[in-house]
Amino acid sequence: MLLNCHSYFSLRYGTIPVQRLVQLGQEHNISAMALTDINNLSGVYEFITACQKAGIKPIVGTEIRDDNQLRYILIAKNQKGFGEIGRFLTKLNERNTSLSTTAPEFKDCYIIYPFASAPTHLKEDEYIGIRSEQLTLLYTEKWKSLMDKIVILHTINHLNEEDYNLHCILRAIDNNTLLSKLTDRDCAAPTDIFKTEEQLVVEFRDYPIIIENTKELINSCNYSFTFKVPRNKKHYTECKQTDTDLLEQLAYTGMINIYGKDHVKAQERLAKELKVINELNFAGYFLITWDIIQYSNSQGYMHIGRGSGANSIVGYCLGITNVCPLELDLYFERFLNQNRKSPPDFDIDWSWNQRDDILRYIFSKYGKEHVAFCGAVSTFKYRSIIREIGKVYGLSKSELDSLTRNPIEHHKTNSIVLLIHQYGQMLEGFPNQRTMHACGILISEDPITNFTALDFPPKGFPVVQFDMHTAEDIGFDKFDILSQRGIGHIDEAAELILQNQGIEVDIRNIALSKDEELCNQQLKTGNTIGCFYIESPAMRGLLRRLQCDNYKILVAASSIIRPGVAQSGMMQEYIYRHNHPNEFEYFHPVFEEQLGETYGIMVYQEDVIKIALHYGGLPATDGDILRRAMSGKSRSLEGLQAVKNRFYEHCDAKGHPRALSEEIYRQIESFAGYSFCKAHSASYAIESYQSLYLKTYYPLEFITAVINNEGGFYRTEVYIHEAAMSGANVLPPCVNSSDLQTTLIGKDLYLGLKLIEGISLELLKTILKERKANGRYESIFDFIQRVPIAIESLQKLIFIGAFQSLGKQKNELLIQAKLLLTKKEPAPALTLLQEPIQEYTFPTLKRSVHEDAFDELELLGFPISCMPFELLKTKFRGDVMVCDLLQNHKKTVRMLGYLIARKHVPTSKGSMYFGTWIDANGHYFDTVHFPDSLTEYPFVGGGCYLLLGTVEVEYHFPNVQILKMARLPFITDPRYHYDDDNNQTTVSKVKEDVSLTHRQPYPKASEINLPRHRMKFTK
């Protein structure tokens, strides 16, 4: 009887979670129910799964609305009908046109029109839906001949009055209006609540034919769906055998090129992998990935292949990855095993400005009917909810700010705020908008609209209406097509080296950079600012603590830095064991046997699986469940709990001490979703080496590429400082030498025009276009004649030094500009002779370095004419410099530091911070700020601080544990020397990088309960 149920996937309309809807059906013995969310199919598969578990017949369809007006409801008779709905909604979304009041032709769908707007003539599969309150209208003659076409249409949208109020709030949010301004047309009827079949039979008892019509329609729907059946494109060629033959041929050709013909281990590993790939029908998946890489190579694009697929020698021989599984002894079972139902992940990275071309190739090659992005759903988050709900209740911006900043306890007497809080809690976690997965692409065997409708976001690539978890449930395995800025850094750096020095660097030849001697020395000292994945303060500190000087240690470090290892409490233990390899005992002989390379500590996902199988005695199927959990793919808490129970049972049966087993499983759990497989770390390490090689031998070109491609850990100012420390002559943006991006000419680094704040991109493009067409600008007069510009923008260009190439002082240029712009007349359409440039003679009006620095601070956000320290009132530069720290272990020192970044870290005693600074010599150092110190001496924004603290040297890495600190004042802005209102405003432009961490505090050594020497556990 329930042919029109909305879930909360009727975005900003429905209020009932899918599981709750089905649960209500089960509680009231509903035999069949239809999910018909508004203009989408997002909740269908969750609904089907829930109905199958509840013993309810699932019926699927959609409610078609146009500008919130109900047109009709579509119900799928079968799988073909569901595909028809998918294609219809897709066409609707793609064209974004208005709907006709009547439905188009459907072969395998029922159409139900609302009673109030039903057409006079109905086709065979068209019906009229009537609500109980409309039954009195059936007495007219018009309806007698249509009685066999009328069915019950009771809408379920909310559960009770409170739910209805939530629905109204959602409608107000969607319409961006006040609750008080909503009309009946905007909202559902208050009576659209859950009703049982018995209630509906009573309401329609005078019209048994309508009841019978409804039952017949329900009974005739036979939509069924089988989960976990592979839906990906099956074959790259015409069939499995030719796929297998081609894959084998390509793999062996690649193997010979890499290893030679007589490499026995490579042959054995390759044969083993190919056998399993064939048995699991994954050849097509490998070949499609290979095909994408072939296109990429043909375009000259650089890529990085990572993920669990990088454990594969097949992937290595095909050129998908650049990680040799033999060199690193990569664990085959992490990549592929007989219990694995889905193919291994190949996460392929391209440069951020090349990925769209790769995507266009995939859509073109495999057909738009068969390719789409995986979907995702953004949900309402509490803080944003409070603001959204506050708006619809009419709160002002200041009230909303107060509401989001202060806890609810501050507003207990305000009834409106209490309502906002009440409905905010109800709304938290509700779907808000459909969006797209960051990188997941689905390539299907059958048309993808057989399974869903498609959305078309602004970029134009189609997106399915379900997320990655649902995709996997129904049989799709995504291809991860990613982009990152790090590859852009490497690519552009190689181009700049060729342009600037005439040297062609084959950076894709990893033998050039991996384990290169000078690079290893840079690693060891943490001199890695700008380098992919190894430039953060935490990573640079780890590299120094480990004295990392080779590829294999870097591979381990790339995984150790992940939260999984740190959350287990084992990062510090790894550092200790690495530095004291003869001063510890393994937890158990299995750890020595399986994890000897990592000193008996679980570092990679493979390590967790090895310990689960060999220490815990779990079967390989449980290992696969753990693999999925560590990859962030498992949603089955019951499945994980069952694995945990079996782990303890097997450990007890093996006679392992219970305390040891509990500690080991605690470490295993910490890896869930926050760890790398070894091959993934190895792929990252190779890219890190590539960028480090360029930084080591071609620092100016590399840092220029980092600035231009963005995406580094630090703000642009830090990379410009790094360039200056590497010998660059840093110059302000220049109308004659700069592009939008930063430009390197020899050792002169001209900052990009786009770095200037407050000047439109259109104007900057006009300046460059005119320069390209008619040559450099010879004077300010010449510039004004050629570029239409307002005085405000021109003054900014002058202040930043963009006309420095003209050889004139800023003050002189400012006067010239004002005179010229106030007198400027429209240029004649045609002139036979170029008018002579008008020149003015002015007295010399020099500006100080400090004035230039404040101009730069205002327009760039940082000074380049001098270091920030030179703007301080004090001449003090610190008692101790960075170069002295290693000799001052345990001593209290005074230092002066310019704040680069600070990172928040939760502890059991409150928040603490790690700070990164540069000293007056331009060198980096790190500080630790414990909660007690921060209470009295907090950070108060960017700038230079006087620091008092104790130097602690931990495994070759010094940091300063801060006791006291204070930000030091800058000099008065010399440009506003007599203007007390403005002479300190520019200082607020000084920036800092702040990162916040939202996680549980890492365990202390005392909480881990595993000393370095083996405990004498009792059974």
Identify the residue ranges that each predicted region occupies.
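Noncatalytic, beta-rich nucleic-acid-contacting surfaces in large DNA/RNA-processing enzymes
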Residues: 32-35, 51-53, 190-191, 241-1019
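Metal-dependent DNA phosphodiester-chemistry modules and their immediately adjacent helices/loops
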Residues: 66-68, 75-98, 174-194, 340, ...
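Short gly/pro/ser/thr-enriched loop/turn and capping motifs at secondary-structure boundaries
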Residues: 41-42, 65-68, 82, 157-161, ...
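Divalent metal-coordination and catalytic microenvironments
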Residues: 4, 37, 58, 78, ...
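Domain-core and long-helix interface of multi-subunit machines
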Residues: 1-35, 39-54, 87-168, 202-207, ...
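Short alpha-helix plus adjacent loop in nuclease-associated cores
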Residues: 11, 64-77, 156-177, 346-348, ...
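Active-site or pore-adjacent capping/gating segments
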Residues: 165-246
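Glycine-rich, histidine-containing beta strand-loop boundary motifs that form or position
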Residues: 36-39, 60-64, 76, 152-156, ...
